[in-house]
């Protein structure tokens, strides 16, 4: 292909992370997005109304041809993909397993935008797991797609630092933009023939499992640094939560926003115990020191300050909040 010829691209993606990559492609004059694939509209929110994906909304705004197959088991869907005549497929958080027939539908194959420094954190939740594990650095990898999950040869990588108070939601937005920029650079170099794929070292691979609501259950038996990493990693979803036990009253499930690491415990305390109010923040005992929470939300209530929570709820509380006793997914 001549370097000056725009790449004909079929884009495959679904959520906001993917929409950022599509937005960068649409702003680049080196390609022509000839088709877009995204997951079918699905019910979401309290009203369970069907809503289009972020990628679909962006694609329709630009008048692009949007397809939403449930899978590619039907040969007719694979043939419809071939009929676009794309040079290359670009995949970003699509959410469907792509059979070899799909990967072979374009002469240059398929490339993927992945939110980690592969081979670390292959899988569905690389951004959240990096934060939850307390990593200081993560990044974006653009790699070729193969049948094995996130195991294809790497084309380009770029690292990004993780702030000590940064949530997975904040990191997601930064990585989404970085991914879009790195994608365009990768495609430009592929078009020019100036990039060499690098195989991944499978021995260094780790897996980032998809998050569930149970991942938000705060484990106060961990150190305050580890608790802070967990709370940041599950913000905004599924959110950090635990159960507050109040004498003579029903237990109350509460969610918390990321707080700060407090001072060392002055005396031993059972992890999960509320040990005081510090500058308007509720102080929870962890394995080594306190964790200070300034915003807390009881079930079915609006968020409130730590001081308001102290006055409104803890006057009738036993003073112990053993989150580790909560039923998973409750």
From Swiss-Prot:
GO CC annotations, alphabetized: cytosol
EC annotation from Swiss-Prot or TrEMBL: 2.1.2.9
Function: Attaches a formyl group to the free amino group of methionyl-tRNA(fMet). The formyl group appears to play a dual role in the initiator identity of N-formylmethionyl-tRNA by promoting its recognition by IF2 and preventing the misappropriation of this tRNA by the elongation apparatus.
InterPro entries xref list: Fmt, Formyl_trans_C, Formyl_transf_N, Formyl_transf_N_sf, Formyl_transferase-like_C_sf, GART_AS, Met-tRNA-FMT_C, Met-tRNA-FMT_N
SUPFAM superfamilies: FMT C-terminal domain-like, Formyltransferase
Sequence similarity: Belongs to the Fmt family.
Keyword flag Protein biosynthesis: yes
GO terms assigned for molecular function: methionyl-tRNA formyltransferase activity
This protein's UniProt keywords: Protein biosynthesis, Transferase
Catalytic activity: L-methionyl-tRNA(fMet) + (6R)-10-formyltetrahydrofolate = N-formyl-L-methionyl-tRNA(fMet) + (6S)-5,6,7,8-tetrahydrofolate + H(+)
Domain of life from the UniProt record: Bacteria
Protein name: Methionyl-tRNA formyltransferase
Annotated Gene3D superfamilies: 3.40.50.12230
Residue positions binding (6S)-5,6,7,8-tetrahydrofolate: 116-119
Pfam families from the UniProt entry: Formyl_trans_C, Formyl_trans_N
């Amino acid at each position: 292909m001549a370097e000056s010829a725009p790449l004909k691209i079929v884009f495959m993606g679904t959520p906001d992370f993917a929409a950022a990559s599509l937005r960068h492609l649409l702003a680049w004059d080196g390609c022509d997005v000839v088709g877009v694939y995204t997951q079918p509209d699905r019910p979401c929110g309290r009203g369970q109304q069907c809503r289009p994906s972020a990628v679909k909304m962006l694609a329709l705004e630009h008048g692009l041809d949007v397809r939403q197959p449930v899978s590619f088991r039907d040969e007719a869907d694979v043939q419809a993909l071939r009929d676009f005549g794309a040079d290359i497929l670009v995949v970003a958080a699509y959410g469907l397993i792509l059979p070899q027939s799909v990967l072979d539908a374009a002469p240059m194959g398929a490339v993927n935008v992945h939110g980690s420094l592969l081979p670390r954190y292959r899988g569905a939740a690389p951004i959240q797991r990096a934060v939850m594990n307390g990593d200081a650095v993560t990044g974006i990898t653009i790699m070729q797609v193969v049948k094995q999950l996130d195991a294809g040869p790497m084309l380009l990588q770029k690292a990004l630092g993780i702030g000590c108070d940064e949530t997975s939601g904040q990191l997601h937005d930064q990585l989404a933009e970085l991914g879009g920029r790195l994608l365009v650079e990768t495609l430009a170099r592929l078009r020019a023939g100036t990039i060499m794929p690098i195989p991944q070292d499978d021995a260094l691979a780790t897996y980032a499992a998809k998050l569930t609501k149970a991942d938000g259950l705060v484990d106060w038996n961990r150190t305050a640094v580890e608790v802070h990493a967990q709370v940041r990693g599950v913000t905004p979803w599924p959110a950090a939560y635990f159960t507050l036990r109040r004498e003579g009253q029903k237990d109350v499930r509460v969610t918390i926003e990321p707080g700060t690491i407090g001072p060392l415990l002055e005396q031993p305390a059972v992890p999960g115990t509320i040990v005081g109010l510090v500058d308007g923040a509720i102080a929870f005992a962890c394995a080594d020191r306190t964790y200070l929470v300034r915003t807390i939300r009881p079930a079915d209530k609006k968020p409130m300050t730590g001081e308001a929570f102290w006055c409104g709820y803890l006057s009738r509380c036993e003073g112990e909040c053993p989150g580790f006793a909560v039923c998973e997914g409750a």
